[in-house]
Amino acid sequence: MIVDERMVTFINSLDEGHTEFLEQLEKEAREDAVPIVRREMQSFLKFLMVAARPKRILEVGTAVGFSALLMCEYNPEPCQIITIENYEKRIPIALDNFKKAGKEEQIELLEGDAAEILPTLTEPFDFIFMDAAKGQYLHFLPEVLRLLKSGGLLVSDNILQEGDLIEIDDFSELCDLDPSYCGYEAQGQEKSEEK
């Protein structure tokens, strides 16, 4: 993992643990080698739920439902979560976990490929969490940004996974297509045009 250890220590110091259900779900997921977010991302998500209090959340990549349940549990505001999962074996497990946690009314699971589902969604989201196939993030980005409410938050897990970074050429190509993907460059261009 590529993270400053001081940052990890700080983020983890904010965390006071999980509910008993989430602790058990995390333990089972790790034992079954199901990929779920690391502790520091769990702490960060909990912090963001309290700070941003999003009412509509989109999650791309459900697995067994751990992250969706964590966001639902630690958001102090009532929220609706739509989560997308493509792996058929995990879908019934996630649905069962939502039911066991009593959150099936707040969390809706859409079954299928996010590349096909995202274009069908129309209502904006306050918060979007991408935790799917990392190689697809750039392909999802145009639709994800279309769905992100103005002032909303986009969080993508494992951008620096195991030392691999988003392909800079692919990112540059996206910036050429739409400068808003590279906000800092677009702002710089506007300033230089004003002079």
Predicted ranges, named:
Residues 1-127, 134-155, 159-195:
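A short alpha-helical cap/connector motif
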